[in-house]
């Protein structure tokens, strides 16, 4: 790789993102990539992973390929880049053939800077053939822990990334993840066949502005309300089930706390509206499953509450890390009950149903999709998972686990998060419009379509039928029928929105008796999950060790001191400062900040006399009273402090 652009990294950052400087380790990772090194970046949640490949992508001469498993996040990033004037596209199972062809043609012609692909795309022989003709400058592996069998989210399709290495042996690889133990990090580099001279950058897992608190209560709702009333500002509450999302949001509303809910089963437009209401502070609390939060960079989340326990410390750390990205003191709260230990054990049993059950689910899926034994190889099928479970009377959690295990064993690729908004492209030439014979409603819809959206002749454009209906004075159903009519007339290509799952056969359908569940997929992964659950259980139910020390130890990092702000450290301290002591501490903080404008929170905490937790509390109080301003991790006086 060469630095093939006259602009340096700071100019690129300023031009496209408007920032003057990089976050910690971003510049070092970018330099390593531009120097042609295979590079590993371990940047905890909120560390700005995407900038580390998007900036070099704009400086390198050819195409940057980004492999990522999260289709919703992929689409969000592409939309964001297009808004910045960067030519970015994505390829995934939810696109039509016409859309896929449009993207691959542009890549062939060198008109794309960044191409996001889902890992299963690397199993397509057609895609691999297309790749050979492209000028590729960089390969990026996002969520790189998915390539490791020891990781908490192993995806076999990630192993196909090695195909890219063989196709482009001279092109370097950037692997990125937010949470990986040392064992997983080493495995990632081994799986991606890092070459000599590789570089590894690990940002500390310590988030000094986050206070980790565990509360024990069998009546969790009571503690949740108390916590949210005690911590002002935006919050996320994580739960494990869709039903509980709705129930808790309704309960919080009754308690006078503004709340909404979010899960994967919601309509795409409904999701977008709820997400925007929360991001713009119209809604204070979002109750959500783990489908919420990826790629959402809201800096002022003051509390992340886990109402249900996650299965691993990797998941917990990633979700808790969505709090306090602005550097201000924030809380990561776990609410635990006595029954949670048993629930964690049940989760292990649900994740690994017995092998006969897995074979049965495989056979039933083939029957449901009408795929004959010996056929189906490399075919993709729409898969209504709810209907499948109803028809065969399957318990959804265990059936889903069976699908994941079949995916990990390499028989199928189950993709359950594809959502596509409606999109339209005009395919008829303009001069033919005058001879079209359209009814009044269709004519009005077609006219408003062209007025409301740009770029319709060049590409598929996302549209909103309800918005078109309001403009055309029609109903959404009339708009839908009008667009279908125009599509049948070959005036437009119309792809209506849908939310569906897919099942992709990576091998021909087998007889169940020949199905093998390898030890590495079943027994070894079951043991690894049992260890992760045990680490989660100890983190929550062991009240003798500082929570931060426990977390850092798990991720292979040594804590210099106990944090002083978690519930364990606070309990040791026991005695709260008097009003006079608290006032004196606030004065000390004001004095230090006044003399050192722009100093870090860490500097102030280490400089003033007193307990760490009390110092952070003093900073919080001064910021609330508008006496100091917090910008990132730095503090600035809003009034002159007198000596």
Regions found by a protein language model. Give the residues of each.
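Helicase motor core with emphasis on the C-terminal RecA-like subdomain
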Residues: 3-16, 20-24, 28-50, 57-60, ...
